[in-house]
């Protein structure tokens, strides 16, 4: 269940709603739409999670508007995580746009490399990715109602390179539980380089998730010759501008 504008209905109602839904199907997911802090709805007796608009807004500030640094981005997401029930954060619906916003690509002035990197954040950071239809083909769309235009089914208008990138991100996410469930070991956000490295570990493997938010290439020689899951090749130490890598340590 996705609950539109759910914060305009009382907590009393949602508590009763949850009891009724879970009585029918215990694993039914209850997702609220709310643009601001939603902790009071996520205490275990109302919703399971919400659409993660704070993630979206911070990603816009980082990549589209370039208003915050990579360390501010990480701090802001960490602050959100710290305020929420720890069981809710992995369920947060991470989005880069929706039926209520302009397409991410539009907000980036059609810079497809920025959407390329935004998709990596969306699919590799903790949370559940909510891919708005057409994003996987770099579909355009300004503010509502233009963002709700019909799906581009004609392959002539579909960006195949973007589609393959989404497929590869999803493949890596699906096949490596460490990305979803791994324990965070280290976060290195370097403002001067405009890079972020997140190290995660589970019982099976340790991964380094690398994000280059600069428009220029960056070197990560400490990971050279290790395996890059996104390229399915040994890593040469170089990440192009506005790109990402997932390295097996």
Task: Mark where each language-model region is.
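A conserved amphipathic helix/loop scaffold
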Residues: 68-70, 181-184, 210-212, 234-235
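Short, glycine-/Ser/Thr-/acidic-enriched flexible segments
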Residues: 35-36, 100-101, 137-138, 203, ...
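Hydrophobic faces of well-ordered beta-strands that scaffold small-molecule active sites
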Residues: 1, 30-32, 51, 94, ...
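C-terminal beta-strand-rich structural cap/linker in extracellular carbohydrate-active enzymes
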Residues: 235-249
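Solvent-exposed beta-hairpin/edge-strand motifs
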Residues: 223-233
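Active-site-proximal substrate-binding groove within the catalytic cores of carbohydrate-active enzymes
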Residues: 80-179
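Active-site-proximal helices and loops of the catalytic beta/alpha 8
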Residues: 4-87, 121, 140-168, 201
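Carbohydrate-binding surface patches
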Residues: 187-223
